[in-house]
Each structure stands twice: as structure tokens, then as C-alpha cells.
Amino acid sequence: HEFDERFDAAKHPNEPHRFGWVVEVDPWDPRSTPVKRTALGRFKHEGATVALSADGRVVVYMGDDERFEYVYKFVSSGRYRPGEREANRALLDEGVLHVARFDADGTGRWLPLVHGQGPLTAANGFASQADVLIRARSAGDALGATKMDRPEWIAVSPQGNYVYCTMTNNSQRGAKDRPGVDAANPRAANVFGHVIRWREAGGDPGSIAPFRWDIFARCGDPAHADEGKRGDVRGDAHGSPDGLWFDPRGLL
């Protein structure tokens, strides 16, 4: 903040709350105004992957690109109407944001970030739904979501609706005074990262029922002497996975 007083949080405590949001731009209308989509939560967004639920609601998968942060999913209240731009403009304004918990038995749950539900109450320091969204990380902490190894890009397979998410790395996993390993983040000092995947109940991205998950790939050199740094990928060794996408043939 030595260059701009606005970033001195002691003087302007709400200035940080301006950052960490998804902003939607209409590429078809150069006169349009970008819109901040606060319902998608405030955190260190790494992409926003859009899918449609079986009943036409809009689903947005997001990772919080920081050590020990979370995977999120937003499900809109309204339904997408093909070819009706005006009707679809506000779909990302109303809906429920969820945070993921990956359990050791290979199941997972989407936990709703809704004010007044569970621990997200005024008694626990959450004044309103706006407060929950502004402090999405704290809300995830309160709900007991799974702290991940820097979740970044997310891609939904066009074949079978598996969802893939990159965990770039986390050299602090298992360090002193830091969270230890768990089923979804199984390597201490995870310098090479991994890719996790899950399949929503019924193959429906909009489902909030329990899902099944597994680790798709552990990154690193398959010949590395240290098992904690050894990859299991056939082919070229790679580490710190970041972006991923599916081509029209369904190849990741």
C-alpha cells in the first residue's frame, strides 16, 4: 500500500472485499457493462466452468487457487432458455453456492453456503447471506469442507459427466502447524500435485446428492526415488497441473 493508500487495510478495511469476485462480460455487446456475480462467492477464483443440469439450471464449478482452500459449485435457481438472451442474463444472480467435502470412503458431499443453515448464523459471526459470500473461505471452514492442495481448473467430461479438477501443488501439506494428509490430498509436501475427479449422482452436474470421487492422477516422475514425489502417469512426466480441457472428441 506504499503506492496507493486505498490498499492500506488499516484505513480502508473493506477495500479487500472489492477483489476476489467473478465478473461476467458479454462478448456480443460492446456497449454492455461487466457484471460482478456476487452469488458465486468471493475467493481466489481459478476459472469458472459452466455446465447445465439435467433440468436446465446453470452450474458453475470453481476452485480457490490457494493452499488448503476449497472446491465450489454454484447451482442457479432459474433455468437456461436457449436463444433467449434477455431471459438468461441474470441466471448467475440467484442460486446456491456449495463447497465440497471429500470423505475417506470415496464419497463426497456438497455443503450449501446458506445463511441461517448449520453454523452459518449470526451467533457464529455471519451477519447475512452477503457476509457468507464475502467470507466464503470462513464459511467453508465452519462447514468442515475439505482443505485441498490448490484447486485450479475444472473440466466436465462430455462422456459420462465425470468432473476433473487439478490440484496444482502444496509444499506445506503436513508441515508443522499445517493440515496433514487426507484421502483427497494424500501426499505430504505435495510439490508435484495431482488430479482429482468425481461423478455427480445420476451424472447430473446440478445434483447436490452425495457423489463418488477418486484420484485420477498423481503427478511427478514415475521413476522418482521418493514415493511421495513419484507420479503414476503413463507417458511424459509432468507436475503442477493447472489448466485442463476436453476437446470435441472427449479427450482430456
Set out the residue ranges of the language-model regions:
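Conserved small-residue
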Residues: 1-252
